[in-house]
């Protein structure tokens, strides 16, 4: 039982003993005491004033005196208006530290075969371009959320839906046919996803030139788009693909495999993975079947041009296209099919889609359509909506070829980390292989932390220069502190200093040492809240606060030079627990920790 739970129970007992009634649910409000006051935890007394029929100050004093007499964990009280500040006895903090040290899974719940199953979908790339900065935020959020849900005792299936078909894919294919001259990734000397992305940009370049030419002849933009022969060829290629044309399908398979190979290398570098990958080319037909079933059952309507729509006006929305006039499907068709396949494949208790907030409407509609089609899981979908990410220069647009590729960004982060280490003279202390590995860990850690520390629901600007800074709220600052603690522990081991498995509980503690133990003990609740609110940012910022707390302690107190063996062992044990908590928390963010920097 945590100190918080213990004192909540004792506070409830105090209210019952003093006022003859049990407090209602939510009336016991314990919070961390503000720094300007004495104490560790503060009880809000206002809810009990009616029961006591006394002033808030008198009520707080009564409850505080009862706790002093009946709860050994409380060593002192301070009343500030309607707030009761409680000081926890040093013995209790030391007992808690022993409990945390003895529990290797502290803060994490272990799933069993009976635990609820959560599926988390993230990444969802198109096979016409490499992953970019927007995908980086998506992948990092999805992977971290999956790890956080695991730490909350859920079984988790990490899944990806690859958008490997559609008009955007045909644009790259057509451009390669027209202007590719048989080039392959090997011939070009570049990753397949980057090569295909080049052809997507090339298509757009020729398409814009064609539109400009048609508009120069007097056509409006809409008329020019309708008259475009290039776009007509792309649409015909899509029709042939859906009809199973052998040549088109063979080209599609070849070019997609180039992209898959490129994606796999990017995912590996990023440190994310998936338990199950679905492909739109396999799921859209299931979706079409469901749409046609809905049409037969009168759930959907067919317009005069042959297109199929869902009328959502009774749900406060508009009409939604499900099949185009030529019979080809849209994203919604695919998502209906994918959802059906997933719930057939796994006994899912919760389905979480990690998709940007520009798709809020899409998932609102998907939930309604699945429910209308008779799927019970329709109302249980969770859209983990996150904000857009930009660079200081502005938004990214893949059609213009100005997008920041994930590969280039990760390479730049690693290179910058290596340069900073070289300038600081750190590289000379390690061999070349270790220096490269540390640069990789620090560079990628800085990238991940900078993105994940931001509330996922907010738009953000990623500044590469700011992200690698050994001061302030950055991943490299946390990693440096971790490496320093690991160095401390190595030196302690070399000196032969022993740390007993159970620390004595009669040691004197300073306020900063108590505060540090209290901060470590909060890890479990932070992990729990991060799972409830789907927020890796809570983990990131908690770890940063823990690091600041530790650095204050390290600055003010001797560890290795402490002459009292018992106090030295305590401070080493506390340092070790802080490092372990940092590592566990960063693992939930997908960030590695370097043993040396």
UniProtKB/Swiss-Prot annotation:
What is catalysed by this protein? Answer: tRNA(Arg) + L-arginine + ATP = L-arginyl-tRNA(Arg) + AMP + diphosphate
Give the main localization category. Answer: cytoplasm
PANTHER family this protein is in? Answer: ARGININE--TRNA LIGASE, CYTOPLASMIC (PTHR11956:SF5), ARGINYL-TRNA SYNTHETASE (PTHR11956)
What domain of life is recorded for the organism? Answer: Bacteria
A Gene Ontology biological process term:
arginyl-tRNA aminoacylation
EC number assigned by the record = 6.1.1.19
What residue ranges carry the coiled-coil annotation?
Answer: none
| Gene3D superfamilies in alphabetical order | Arginyl tRNA synthetase N-terminal domain (3.30.1360.70), HUPs (3.40.50.620), Isoleucyl-tRNA Synthetase, Domain 1 (1.10.730.10)
What keywords sit in the KW lines? Aminoacyl-tRNA synthetase, ATP-binding, Cytoplasm, Ligase, Nucleotide-binding, Protein biosynthesis
One GO cellular component this record assigns the protein to is:
cytoplasm
Record's protein name: Arginine--tRNA ligase
């Amino acid at each position: 039982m945590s100190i918080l739970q213990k004192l909540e129970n004792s506070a409830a007992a105090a209210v019952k003993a003093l006022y003859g009634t049990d407090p209602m649910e939510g009336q016991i409000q314990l919070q961390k005491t503000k720094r300007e006051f004495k104490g560790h935890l503060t009880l809000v007394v206002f809810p009990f004033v009616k029961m006591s029929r006394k002033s808030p100050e008198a009520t707080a004093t009564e409850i505080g005196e009862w706790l002093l007499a009946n709860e050994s964990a409380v060593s002192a009280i301070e009343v500030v208006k309607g707030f009761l500040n409680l000081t926890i006895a040093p013995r209790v903090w030391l007992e808690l530290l022993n409990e945390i040290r003895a529990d290797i899974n502290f803060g994490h719940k272990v799933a069993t075969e009976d635990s609820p199953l959560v599926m988390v979908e993230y990444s969802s790339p198109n096979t016409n371009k490499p992953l970019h900065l927007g995908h980086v935020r998506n992948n990092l959020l999805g992977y971290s959320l999956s790890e956080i849900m695991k730490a909350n005792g859920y079984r988790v299936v990490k899944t990806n839906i690859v958008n490997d078909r559609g008009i955007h894919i045909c644009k790259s294919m057509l451009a390669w046919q027209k202007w590719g001259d048989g080039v392959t990734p090997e011939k070009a000397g570049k990753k397949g996803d980057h090569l295909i992305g080049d052809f997507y940009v090339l298509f757009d370049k020729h398409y814009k030139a064609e539109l400009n030419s048609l508009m120069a002849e007097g056509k409006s933009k809409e008329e020019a788009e309708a008259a475009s022969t290039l776009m007509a060829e792309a649409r015909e290629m899509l029709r042939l693909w859906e009809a199973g044309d052998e040549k088109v399908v063979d080209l599609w398979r070849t070019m997609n495999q180039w992209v898959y190979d490129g994606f796999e290398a990017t995912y590996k570098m990023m440190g994310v993975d998936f338990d199950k990958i679905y492909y739109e080319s396999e799921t859209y037909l299931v979706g079409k079947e469901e749409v046609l079933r809905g049409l037969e059952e009168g759930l959907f309507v067919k317009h005069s041009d042959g297109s199929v729509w869902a009328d959502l006006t009774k749900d406060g929305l508009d009409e939604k296209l499900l099949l185009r006039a030529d019979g080809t499907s849209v994203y919604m068709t695919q998502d209906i099919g994918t959802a059906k396949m997933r719930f057939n494949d796994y006994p899912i208790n919760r389905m979480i889609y990690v998709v940007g907030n520009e798709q809020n409407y899409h998932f609102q509609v998907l939930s309604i359509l699945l429910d209308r089609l008779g799927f019970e899981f329709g109302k249980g979908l969770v859209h983990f909506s996150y904000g857009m990410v930009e660079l200081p220069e502005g938004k990214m647009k893949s059609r213009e070829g100005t997008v920041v590729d994930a590969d280039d960004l990760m390479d730049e982060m690693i290179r910058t980390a290596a340069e900073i280490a070289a300038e600081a003279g750190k590289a000379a202390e390690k061999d070349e292989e270790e220096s490269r590995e540390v640069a990789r860990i620090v560079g990628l850690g800085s990238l991940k932390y900078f993105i994940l520390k931001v509330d996922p629901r907010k738009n953000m600007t990623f500044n590469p220069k700011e992200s690698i800074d050994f001061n302030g709220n950055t991943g490299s600052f946390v990693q440096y502190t971790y490496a320093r603690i690991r160095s401390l522990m190595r030196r302690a081991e070399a000196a032969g200093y022993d740390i007993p498995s159970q620390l004595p509980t009669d040691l004197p503690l300073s306020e900063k040492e108590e505060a540090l133990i209290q901060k470590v003990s909060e890890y479990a609740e932070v992990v729990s809240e991060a799972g409830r609110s789907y927020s890796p940012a809570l983990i990131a910022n908690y770890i940063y606060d823990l690091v600041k707390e530790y650095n204050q302690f390290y600055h003010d107190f001797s560890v290795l030079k402490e002459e009292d063996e018992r106090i030295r062992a305590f401070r080493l044990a506390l340092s070790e627990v802080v490092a372990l908590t940092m590592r566990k928390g960063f693992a939930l963010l997908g960030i590695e920790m370097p043993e040396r920097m």
